[in-house]
């Protein structure tokens, strides 16, 4: 519909903003219902025409916020705190995951056979969340700048992005433990639900039943033992259950857990006994990049100068000069995803900086590792694989192993480096075997649900927030999660 707007002596034709336009603006700008209504009012006033905005906006906003109301339940559950005492916590969860998936497929016009499901687990902003993404297998995204032809809020988001993500369960103000994850998984009843799981390494270890910390058998996917310099036998779900049963029958002594592959809890994965863990669980693209990048940065800090303090000061100055900010997910000196990528690409500048202080010769082997890993990330960690990715992995692995053999105490093989060396190629071959596609690690990346914490926090603060002591807190939190998910359909 076209609306005629008087402007002085001239007349201009302006497209009427539809209800759908406002729903898109509400989502893309992070507006509350009240703010969206105010925006519509300002547009009507500014154009001096009530018809500049399609009627029925208020009703549509309310309807959109409640589209999934019947599919989410609020419960109070008992969670053990650090002192071993039970505390009541609020859990919001989807009471019918299958129906939710069918609703999403219908709303998005997708066929189930042409989609992949991805589950994510992560704690952020005080709450433990379990998320679902439905991804189009043949999705091809338009690149380049948004144009006016795209319309209001016209930028299209990938099917696996934060803006299309569903939060299936939220456990408020709770620790990240085996028991809390178990509560959520059992409520959602995932049996026979075909989905790939990805998360950070700590969470993946919880899911397969391993204890936390510095483990003798720290790989999620195989039975390799420290120093993790060799490829182990890939786990099947039945292997994990057998190890756990043997651990329990031997008395369940955690001091002897290394004799049982560190499997101290029953695995929480719902899959066929003979299924491999690798494939059902995806190597976490983001956390592999963060972990390996941080490891190489710390080696530079510890080995190039006479003291680690000098090394840290040098790296801090270098990062500041490159406008690379610190404070990542691991500690106040670590880097987040984009910053890690910039650090990996800044090797020429890093060479120049070390050469200025006469330390390039000592730093050069690690700088070469950074370059090699940067090539690996470019070819492997994206949504689509680039040619030569297997060679890039092999070259990085060979270079790191050579330094490990020369100095095993410095160039230790962490679980993340082990996964990059031995399991990333295996996984990508599995991922693309049936379809012949060239999908990279980014296809099953955990980045979308890493971002969901800040996205939800913005909405929570913007008109939804109530105190946990509020008498109706559980229902308020449920309505919030329903609205968040309903606006992501």
Where are these regions (language model features)?
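A structural signal for the principal folded core domain
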Residues: 1-489
């Amino acid at each position: 519909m076209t609306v005629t707007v008087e402007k002085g002596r001239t007349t201009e034709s302006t497209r009427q903003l539809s209800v759908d336009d406002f729903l898109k603006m509400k989502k893309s700008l992070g507006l509350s219902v009240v703010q969206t209504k105010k925006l519509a009012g300002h547009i009507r006033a500014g154009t001096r025409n009530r018809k500049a905005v399609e009627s029925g906006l208020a009703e549509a906003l309310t309807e959109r916020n409640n589209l999934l109301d019947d599919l989410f339940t609020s419960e109070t559950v008992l969670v053990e705190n650090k002192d071993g005492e039970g505390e009541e916590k609020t859990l919001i969860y989807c009471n019918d995951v299958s129906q939710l998936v069918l609703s999403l497929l219908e709303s998005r016009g997708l066929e189930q056979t042409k989609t992949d499901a991805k589950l994510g687990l992560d704690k952020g902003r005080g709450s433990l969340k379990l998320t679902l993404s439905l991804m189009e297998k043949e999705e091809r995204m338009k690149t380049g700048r948004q144009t006016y032809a795209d319309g209001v809020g016209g930028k299209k988001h990938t099917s696996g992005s934060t803006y299309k993500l569903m939060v299936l369960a939220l456990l408020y103000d709770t620790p990240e433990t085996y028991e809390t994850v178990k509560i959520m998984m059992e409520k959602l009843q995932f049996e026979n639900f075909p989905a790939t799981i990805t998360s950070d390494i700590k969470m993946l270890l919880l899911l397969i039943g391993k204890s936390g910390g510095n483990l003798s058998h720290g790989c999620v996917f195989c039975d390799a033992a420290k120093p993790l310099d060799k490829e182990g036998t890939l786990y099947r779900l039945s292997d994990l259950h057998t190890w756990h049963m043997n651990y329990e029958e031997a008395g369940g002594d955690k001091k002897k857990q290394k004799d049982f592959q560190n499997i101290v809890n029953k695995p929480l994965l719902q899959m066929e006994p003979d299924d491999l863990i690798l494939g059902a669980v995806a190597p976490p693209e983001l956390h592999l990049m963060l972990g390996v990048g941080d490891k190489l940065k710390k080696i530079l800090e510890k080995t190039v100068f006479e003291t680690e303090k000098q090394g840290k000061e040098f790296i801090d100055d270098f990062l500041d000069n490159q406008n690379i900010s610190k404070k990542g997910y691991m500690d106040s000196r670590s880097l987040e995803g984009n910053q890690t990528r910039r650090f990996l690409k800044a090797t020429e500048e890093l060479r120049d900086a070390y050469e200025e202080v006469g330390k390039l010769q000592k730093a050069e082997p690690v700088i070469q590792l950074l370059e090699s890993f940067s090539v690996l990330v470019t070819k492997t960690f994206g949504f689509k694989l680039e040619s030569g990715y297997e060679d890039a992995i092999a070259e990085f692995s060979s270079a790191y192993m050579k330094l490990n053999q020369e100095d095993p105490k410095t160039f230790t093989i962490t679980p993340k480096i082990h996964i990059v060396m031995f399991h990333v190629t295996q996984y990508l071959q599995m991922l693309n075997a049936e379809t012949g596609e060239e999908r990279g690690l980014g296809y099953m990346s955990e980045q979308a649900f890493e971002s969901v914490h800040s996205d939800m926090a913005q909405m929570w603060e913007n008109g939804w927030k109530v105190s946990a002591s509020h008498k109706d807190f559980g229902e308020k939190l449920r309505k919030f999660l329903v609205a968040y998910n309903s606006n992501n359909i």
